[in-house]
Amino acid sequence: MAAPSPAGGAPSHAQSSLPSLPAHLQSDTHLTAHLASRFHVGLPTARLSSQALISLNTYTTSTKGPDGGKEGSAMGEAEDLAKRAFTRLGARGENQAVVFLGESGSGKTTIRSHLLSAFLSFSSTPLSSKLSYAAFLFDTLTTTKSLTTQTASKAGLFLELQYDGSSSVNPTLIGGKIIDHRLERSRITSVPTGERSFHVLYYLLAGTSPAEKAHLGFDKAVHVSTSSGAIGHKRWRYLGHPTQLKVGVNDVEGFQHFKTALRKLEFPRSEIAEICQILATILHIGQLEFASGQATTTHAEESGGYSHEGGETVTIVKNKDVLSIIAAFLGLSVEDLENSFGYRTKTIHRERVTVMLDPKGARQNADELARTIYSLLVAYVIEAVNQRICAAEDSVANTISIVDFPGFAQACATGSTLDQLFNNAATELLYNFCLQSFFDRKADELEREEVSVPATSYFDNTDAVRGLLKHGNGLLSILDDQTRRGRTDNQLLESLRRRFENKNPTIIVEGSKRTSLISQNARSAFTVKHFAGEIDYSVNGLIEENGEFISGDLMRLMKSTKSDFVRELFGQAALQTVTHPKEKTAIMQAQVSSKPLRMPSMARRKTSPSSRLAFDAGDADEVESQAESIAKDSSSGRRKSAMLTSGIQGAAGQFLSSLDIVNKCLSSTNLNPYFIFCLKPNDRRIANQFDSKCVRAQVQMFGIAEISQRLRNADFSVFLPFAEFLGLAEIGNIVVGSDKEKAEVVLDEKRWPGNEARVGSTGVFLSERCWADLAKVGERVVPVYAADMSDEGGDGLLHPRSTGYGDSKVRLLNPADQSPGAFIYGDEAKQGYFGSRDLDGRSDAGNSAFNSGDMFRNHETREQMLEKGNEKKMEEVDDAPISGSRKRWIALVYLLTFYIPDFAIKLFGRIKRKDVRMAWREKFAINLIIWFSCGVAIFFIVAFPGLVCPTQHVYSAAELSSHNGKDGHSSFIAIRGVVFDLDKFMPGHYPHIVPESALKKYAGVDATGLFPVQVSALCQGKSGSVDPMVLLDYRPTNISGSATTISGTDTNSVYHDFRHFTNDSRPDWFYEQMVMLKANYLKGYVGYTPKYLNTLGKKSQSIGSINGKVYDLTSYIAGGRLTKAPPGETVPSDVDTDFMDNSVVSLFQSLPGQDLSKHWENLKIDPALRRRMQLCLDNLFFVGHVDTRNSAQCEFARYFILAISVLICSIIVFKFLAALQFGRKNVPENLDKFIICQVPAYTEDEESLRRAIDSMARMRYDDKRKLLVVICDGMIIGQGNDRPTPRIVLDILGVPESVDPEPLSFESLGEGQKQHNMGKVYSGLYEVQGHIVPFLVIVKVGKPSEVSRPGNRGKRDSQMVLMRFLNRVHYNLPMSPMELEMHHQIRNVIGVNPTFYEFILQVDADTVVAPDSATRMVAAFLNDTRLIGVCGETALTNAKNSAVTMIQVYEYYISHNLTKAFESLFGSVTCLPGCFTMYRIRSAETAKPLFVSKEVVDAYAEIRVDTLHMKNLLHLGEDRYLTTLLLKHHSKYKTKYISSAKAWTIAPESWTVFLSQRRRWINSTVHNLIELIPMQQLCGFCCFSMRFVVFVDLLSTVIQPVTLAYIIYLIYWLVKDTSTIPYTSLILLAAIYGLQALIFIIRRKWEMVGWMIVYLLALPVFSLALPLYSFWHMDDFTWGNTRIITGEKGRKVVISDEGKFDPASIPKKKWEEYQTELWEAQTSRDDRSEVSGISYGTKSYHPAQSEYGFPGSRPMSQLDLPRFGSRMSLAPSEMMSRHADMEMENLSHLPSDDAILAEIREILRTADLMSVTKKSIKLELERRFGVNLDLKRPYINSATEAVLAGAL
């Protein structure tokens, strides 16, 4: 107000109104100085009349003035402004608005809270409390701590207080509304250094109880001790640096307030818990760690692996525990969630493409999920709050609006250019509105009323606002348009340059029109001259960021959620979805709305014509229509579903429309605006410091000096018509004259200054002060209700925030406590929206447990949620009969695994599904069988010979003599038939004085004579004792001549003679010595063969054997019994020397040299005597053991092993011979058979694909007779690729992007509805190095509903596309639309009848074939008409890339040249590798289908793959299974290998991929051979035929680990005992590898010598590690969700979560019918068939056809073939089918196709056909219709062609 200057004595700083300062002080510098003088005395505010407030942030308190009260403080001024606004609201019925302007850190949020507190204090309803909570929730969710402030707002706020019109004195508050604008989503995942993310995330982390932390997964945080010993915090990626967890914000208290606010706003407790879970989920998403891995597990939807054999590089989550927490809270399957991070589906060139992401891409995907969830949560909470506080629109009479957008951003802290641009655009608009309010609008009013005031110059930012925000061609509109059109960032830059260059000075795009690539990269930015300074905005990534599209993958994933709350989050109106035009249920992508869900209450009301400053009716209509559309969205509560062509807005378009509404609401006639300029006193956040330079810059920026000057000239805020003015003045009839004269009299009386009161032509202009004086508003009482007033519930009112950055202790229960609300506003002892009464002053029943205990107490546990999320919705799809063989196998499985209970598998194996547990049992049973087989093999190799012929440790006389210690031999010695190790004994011989040389002379001899024995000590005789004087003279005459014997007269014998007659009698000495020697030095026994014993018997030797022991009684019988008495004694006469029983002696005498065992048993003697006689025999007459080493059983054991070895050796020899017989190479003649060359492509790179395609195109085979067919499995961009695989293939083949055929339906291999697939067919000619080859490309694109991996079904499905097509061609069966199109392209375009093709060559996309390979294979087929399949030799191209590839080189070589060559001898190669094989399509003589016969195709197309056996057949080794099917169903035909056809492929380079590949091969081998063994007609001569080959292959696969064990056993044997060398085994090994070596030597493959050595070193890997790993991981699959369960009455039912497939959904018809319709359509001059559902193209046949079916004059390599002919469709479609993919525009303003066609005919009727062009026709049409027809260009072009060709 231009109040009078303060009294002369008053200091200058006492003047609060800047316009009241003298004119010489109205400059930026002087005003800044005045603000400084006020700031330094504690008055941080000033006024610009009554319309604006200037507030300086003191960084201390906002509640204390100079005297300690609130007078003069920011809070006091805010309350004063609120009081004035409220008064005007009541007195004049005007809407009020308070607009905040200021930089970040200037205290806007704080002043806003004071202002809201003041407004709410004028009402006594409980609604005031709710509005307070609502504002707090908004701040909690959208404010953060920045470098400049603790409370930086990061979302635009339009807060509306709603009043009814029942009282003109005190309007009643009836509701409120929070309208949020554009949350800074990028902050969630990108927290700037030194700043925080949104406060609520920190509250959650700090404020939850231990029990809640455990539930939310926060308890697993690892606390790391820092160097100072303090406990550091776990680093949360989304919370910035750990130091930001402790920055003076009371997060613990904040969380309690957060929960209290939600509860007071009537959020159910379960919902509060869900909200907390979602917030925790966001934090956990930030913790996910991604890594690259190999997809070594076969996926359920795969119909077979590619050449990389499951080695596809995929992205995996490393910390699965965190992943499971996220999955539980989102109600999702862990597996689905992990997979969703690894890929992203995009729309590129109107095609849906799945991009396989690397870990970096997966991180970005996870970040997008976090941003999306948080944005949706904020939208949900705000909308839920609005539903609780908003009044019915019709009951709202007036509103007070508080508008606070984030401050101007000089830089984008989070890296988001889009957020910075939106921020600054909004600030620019609000500042422009401020200028309009002070300058332009008032000038217009004054001019209308013929009041003249001096003009004031000011900085006008209208150019910037128009440049940024103008509809249609403003910067944001252009950005949105370019996003919608799918343009690039540089194209956007070029569009901006064209629009603004030399047209708008505020937007500068540097660079010329032809900017070079270097300069584009150097400066891809544009500059905007804002009122606050110039800002450069980078365009890099701006288009994509503006799209803000949520991928369809995420929407599809969330569709499967089991959480009702998450479903509600993703089902709200804030999420707009884009559905496919042809399938409304298929969500292509979605978008979180960047505009608010609600509109200002006044926005929908048209302003009355009588209002001042009315904007035009068009604006009103526009605002109304926007309001209605948004209201419709929010009221329905459903997602707004938009078609792909419906023009869904990008973020810029939405933000622009919301700003437009804000502007028009603020600019409406019945609204009075106030402005609060918030200034920073310095840039360093230092309390009570005033930086004049900093403040002056802000004063200049906001043009405060110009505004002040304007107010000095014209401070008019109220316009009163004369009648109203005079009524208020109450002058009655005192003054006579016109109303104008009366008004002038009143003004003269009032003596108001001229800048505050002027009379116009129809009324009076007044300032707010003058109006207040006139209307006596000072007499009105504005009630202010105490903060501790209770609401109806009795709770203390949560009063709006009353302090901002001060330390007022008002309303605190305990001044010592931390003030409620201080947690969010940074400084000490602060109070926020909450008064402390409410926090803990009184607890609601049960609330204490909720606040301090566990809010999840009655909630589902995380484990329950996870289990729920992993469940799939299943439905019955089919019956599943169980075969008899399957039942028998299951019985055997249970027999082998019955001891493992089901619950144990479920508990320890964590296998919940019954069918997967059954598979585990099957796997375990198979492993048991394999292990048993290995055990049997080991038994026969090692144990069987030992059982049949036990090992004997015996030495014949000759063998004993050889151990004489000479020539390196060991030294043995024999004593009484026992052989000892003399070498070992000699070092320990006692006494030591005897030299070893003296002992060595006894080596190799029988030294029994050296050891005389005491007979009485060793034998008890017949009676139980023998006289000690009896001696036995022992002479070992039986082995004389073989080994030297030592006689008893040897000089050394006296040292061992301790018999009774000696002086030193030791009866037991010999026995003790023998016990000691046997224990330490025993080597064996002297051996006597039965033959040698017989010989000795014939020589009158009394020798025989009993139970294997040999006894010699010759010396006893021959009188060797003596007696001798000790010295001095005589021998008694009655000494009996016959101590042996006569019957025993006579036994040896009568049967010398024989086995006496049975006779011994039959002797008629008592047991005691038998025991005594046995003792005497063992101690005195034992001479050795019977040597049975050459017996019959031992010979059998030896020759049995030899026979097996010979058998194996013979197989090896046969393999060798088989390899040799294929040595001759013949060069076949030129052949004229038609062949198809098929290449399945998945995610290979361009180099691999080009190599494969080029090698097939360059094959030396007639180009006309080969057809190159490439089948692309899905729209997928592999890791490392920049385009989807189909696009790479089409680019290689030269098909332009403009060619876009219609996708057509066909059957696929998949579960449920995935059996319905769609594909595009391209054809043309490929030209390379002089070869021109016709090609057909089939791209599987999937149904519109397929969001992730569209069209992808696996390699087997790719093979089936061609097999099923050829099958239907040969059987003349009805075909699917895509097959009809294939038939049409091959027959009518390429010009070959599909039945002509006889052979199909299947090559993988990473395989290169030799130029002559096809010729050699076809020659082999022609030579043998009984041949059905032929494979060639495959070598490696990456042999030296890694150790893993090096060990495979030799193995690849021998697997072909030995194994396959051997199998080929019998015409039964059991595995024709899919990477390089040719098949016979039909028989040569009868044209009977072979490869594509009904039986083979039906069996190979098996969809129900739900058992372990079928999984291994069809998911692991589909190539081998295809061979198995050919051998089963065409048993009279042969499969062969020819070494002359060569190809080169890429082997796995990493261990994981190699392991996965071999697991597939080994397991599929086992299961396929099991399939083959029961086959009939497989036996040949002596069974040496295919069945034998199959059995040998199966056995060798199963017992592979044993072969290595055997080799190790041999090595151990050799090392252990060098004396016995197993020559047979060594010869066998030498034969195995020697013959292999001979093969490559004969073929001069010298390099194979080195590779063979490498292979031998890797033998443990191939023979042991790989088989064992493979057998145990036989059930390692992703099992999918189709399974068999037991239904009613035991019926086996197939259930699936993919839905039931309806075969009728794919229409089929025979080729003849289709061809007839095609011909009729070509001749009927009609472009549509309403009956058949076939839409036709516009090109007719060319009369001059080449041999390919092409026009002869046209360049073949550039044919635009897909536009020719017909396109099948499920319904009649418009010509060219491209209208569905047009730009997303509203086509209603365009002329109809019929109208365009009529005009085209008219133009062509009169045009010169020699000069007319399509472009000229389009221009003429645009002239005639008066509209732009760019969107109709495809139709115009095609219709023009059709008219010219006569088709229309």
Swiss-Prot record:
Residues 1-22, 593-621 are annotated as: Disordered. ATP binds at G102, E103, S104, G105, S106, G107, K108, T109. GO terms for molecular function: actin binding; ATP binding; chitin synthase activity; cytoskeletal motor activity. Disruption phenotype: Leads to reduced levels of mycelial chitin, periodic swellings along the length of hyphae, and a block in conidiation. Does not affect virulence in a mouse model of pulmonary aspergillosis. Residues 659-683 are annotated as: Actin-binding. GO terms for cellular component: cell periphery; cell septum; cell tip; myosin complex; plasma membrane. The keyword RNA-binding does not apply. Residues 952-1040 form the Cytochrome b5 heme-binding domain. Keywords: Actin-binding, ATP-binding, Cell membrane, Glycoprotein, Glycosyltransferase, Membrane, Motor protein, Myosin, Nucleotide-binding, Transferase, Transmembrane, Transmembrane helix. Glycans are attached at N1038, N1063, N1423, N1457, N1563, N1786. It catalyses: [(1->4)-N-acetyl-beta-D-glucosaminyl](n) + UDP-N-acetyl-alpha-D-glucosamine = [(1->4)-N-acetyl-beta-D-glucosaminyl](n+1) + UDP + H(+). The chain crosses the membrane at residues 889-909, 928-948, 1200-1220, 1595-1615, 1621-1641, 1648-1668. GO terms for biological process: asexual sporulation resulting in formation of a cellular spore; chitin biosynthetic process; fungal-type cell wall organization; hyphal growth. It holds the Pfam family Myosin_head. Residues 1-17 have a biased composition (Low complexity). It is found in: Cell membrane; Cell septum; Cell tip. Residues 1790-1845 form the DEK-C domain. Induction: Expressed during hyphal growth. It is an enzyme of class 2 (transferase). Its main location: membrane. In the N-terminal section; belongs to the TRAFAC class myosin-kinesin ATPase superfamily. Myosin family. The N-terminal myosin motor-like domain (MMD) does not seem to have motor activity but is indispensable for polarized cell wall synthesis via binding to actin that ensures the proper localization to the hyphal tips and septation sites near actin structures. PANTHER family: CHITIN SYNTHASE. Polymerizes chitin, a structural polymer of the cell wall and septum, by transferring the sugar moiety of UDP-GlcNAc to the non-reducing end of the growing chitin polymer. Important for hyphal growth and conidiophore development but not pathogenicity. This is Chitin synthase E. It comes from Aspergillus fumigatus (strain ATCC MYA-4609 / CBS 101355 / FGSC A1100 / Af293). The lineage of its organism: Eukaryota, Fungi, Dikarya, Ascomycota, Pezizomycotina.
